[in-house]
Amino acid sequence: HVANDLRRWQRILFDHGWGATMWPAEFGGTGWDKTRQYLFDIECVTGDAPIQLPFGLKMVAPVLMAYGSDAQKSRFLPRILDGTDWWCQGYSEPGSGSDLASLKTRADRDGDHYVVNGQKAWNTLGQHADWIFCLVRTDPSAKPQRGISFLLIDMKTPGIRVQPTRLLDGRHEVNEIFFDDVRVPGGN
């Protein structure tokens, strides 16, 4: 199964100290410069090695490194690095595509949680994800380009439903993800 193979490959790289060639050493990466990263990537391609999924390693991790709290960094980065947690992206929405200013998925504050309602589309391999990093509207009164927040949501949270989208080739590599009163801790 593709998901198991990719997780296993990430674990092998991690065990050899190569789990994140693009990460700084302070976060468990190699700390390599761009040239060494490129040479490593070329060797992996030449050896027909599996890919490393970008969602955790190259998309959410750099955001956490730059803007996350110390608690978020210690909670999420090691599990991304060793392949324990699989991530997917929650940006696009039906009828909006990648126009983030028009996103409609809402996250309303309720005490120390957000309550998320809405739908995301074109979530690559989301059916295998443990977590989704999601853009949500937290201030509907703000200009469309503002009032948007970045939440980290556990895919096992009650109220989440993943529906595969059949592609022209018959595969199910993308999904729609529905959020129905999904409670997310404010610290995420």
Residue ranges and their predicted role:
Residues R7-T84, T124-W131:
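Internal helix-loop-helix
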Residues G17, F40-V45, V136, L152-T157, ...:
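Short Ser/Thr-interspersed hydrophobic loop/turn segments at strand-loop and sheet-helix junctions
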Residues G95-L103:
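Active-site-adjacent elements of ketosynthase-type condensing enzymes
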Residues G83-Y91, L135:
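A short, Trp-centered hydrophobic/proline-enriched beta-strand micro-motif
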Residues G97, A121-G126, L168-D169:
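Glycine-rich phosphate/pyrophosphate-binding beta-alpha loops
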Residues S102, K156-R183:
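Flexible, small-/acidic-enriched active-site or ligand-binding loops
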Residues H113, N117-R161:
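A short core secondary-structure module
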Residues T105-D108:
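A structural signal for short hydrophobic beta-strand segments in well-ordered beta-sheet cores
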